Structures are given as C-alpha cells and as structure tokens.
Amino acid sequence: MIPDASSCCSADSISRAKQILALIPGRATGAYSHSQGIKGLRDAIASGIASRDGFPANADDIFLTDGASPGVHLMMQLLIRNEKDGILVPIPQYPLYSASIALHGGSLVPYYLNESTGWGLEISDVKKQLEDARSRGIDVRALVVINPGNPTGQVLAEENQYDIVKFCKNEGLVLLADEVYQENIYADNKKFHSFKKIVRSLGYGEEDLPLVSYQSVSKGYYGECGKRGGYMEITGFSAPVREQIYKIASVNLCSNITGQILASLVMNPPKASDESYASYKAEKDGILASLARRAKALEVAFSKLEGITCNKAEGAMYLFPQICLPQKAIEAAKAANKAPDAFYALRLLESTGIVVVPGSGFGQVTISLVEISRKTNI
C-alpha cells in the first residue's frame, strides 16, 4: 500500500512534485520531450544559473543531456571536421576528452598544468602549445578547461579565469568549461566562479566569445551517476551554428526525463523558507564535510610518506600525488614491459589490496598516481 505522501514528505516537496508533473506533457516520464529538454525544467535551471552568477540566463541556451558526457561528444562532433582540427586539453587529463576527440577524428593538443604551482594553468604554456599546433597545420578550434580539476583537484583562481577568457577571445577559440565539480570546494581560500560569470563580468556579450558550460547530477553532493542527468549551456554562438547544435541534439531525440528532473532540482534546490530546507541543508553539508575530511586525511597521509609529494586538496574528488621511485624499481618495471607507475600500482594492489590509477593513463609524463576514495566515511 502506498502511504499518504503528506505523512512522509514535506509540503514543499509535494508541491514541487506536482509542479514538475504539470510541466510534463501527459504528466508522465515515459514520453519524448523537446530535444533540448522540457521547457519548464530548463526555466528552473536558467533561474538557478542566474541566482548563482548574478547575470541573466536563458532557457533557450540550455540543452539537457544524459550526464555531461553526451554534451562533450556533441560539441566534438560539431567542432571536428578532420584530423587537422585540434582541441586544447589539459594534461593530466580526464580521458573522456582524448577518447571523444579520437572518436570524431580530431587532434588532441595538450597543454600542461604546472604541478609546482598547485596544478596551475599557465597562459604562456597554452599559447606555446597553440602556436606549435598551428605551425604544424592544425586548426585549433577550442580550449577545454576543467574547474575544479579532474584528476588534479585544483580550483582555478578568479584572476586566472579572466586571463583564460581573454586568451580565448583573442585567439578565436571556443571555451569548453567542464564545471561538474562546482559544489566540491574544500579549501577555505578558494571559491568557484563559473566561466559564464567571468565572461559577463568582463562585459562580453553574445558576439564576443562562444562558451559551452557543463554541469552534471553525477558529482557534487548529489552523486546520482546512474540517473544520467546533466546539461550544457551554450552562449556566444551565431544563429546558424546554434541551428546545427540543435540538429545534432535532435538526432538523439531527447535525454531521459528522470535525469532532466534531477538536473532542474540540482540547480534549483529548496529555499531557506521551505519546510524541507533544514533537512536538505543538513544532508548537503554533511556529505561535503565528509568529502573534505577524506581529502584532507589523504593529503596529510601522503605528506608524511617518504618519496611522495602531493598538492593540497582544493576541490573535486581527487588527489594526484607524485611518487619518486628508485632506479631499481624503474628497471624492474622496464623488465616487466610496463610503465613505472603502472608497475607500482599493480604491486601495490597485490601487496595491500589498495587500488590506485597510474598517472600515465591521464597523460602525465612523471611517475604519478591518482587515488580516489569516496566510500569510507571519516
């Protein structure tokens, strides 16, 4: 027997559920929606973006997707015509980007985050890589920035973001802003600023800079990976280009309705005046505090280990320590026909049962590892 909703749910959550159902044609989640997603849900997301940034947002700029990944693939399909089209990607990199670029036949143009400055993004290096690629006949079309960083866990300084936006404008690049960890900030001296906010703060309008911003329900404090909800917000594109984006999105008909609903809830959560707010805030704060404790515990533990250096845990869900292996271990790895960090990771697994990911899998050239811990509560 289904209990009366009022006996187990707050009045505002019941009201929100009714409002959402009213937005869906037929009041059911089993039918197709508009290819960009249900208009009322996009309105809710636009409202959340505007509240976050302090600048207006338009529901027509929002494409709801099955997580952020399909939005990345869509833009790669749009941007890449052949192997001479390049995309600037940070190294260490989230493998989604290299895989998507390869899938669509383009060229990955790496730029290297500076480990000695907390995995900082240095415009001088990005410019060097851009010029080198252009000298080889590669038409570099976009710059990917992941903030907070995956797999490096850094949070970009606001001043650095201004430099990035100006660089993209001057060089005629599309800015692809992966912001799916925007809620995961652990350093007291760091704050998330969306690139949309940075662009508008500079006074740039629709004619100045093409920007694609990604968000997902898989990360943050919600972590609903299997629900496959997310969106991309596109601004600064001409009408003919927007038409092509819509055509590509239409090929997949629409994203799943449950994920669309979750994306709207993530960007438009309970307000302080709502009955459910205290419960929502307690759970949110508890999850983020637990993630911060785990990040700090690992950071401190790594700093005490001989031969290991690790930057501070600022955001996302990752630490990226560097392991200095002795020459004998490097020679043993070579004899086993394995990369030194992969050799170390396998030996660690065999000896302790601890799973780490070799840094070389993220394009890192030094002997580094990523350790990800999300399950143990501290």
Pin down the residues of each PLM region:
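PLP-dependent class I/II
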Residues: 1-36, 40-378
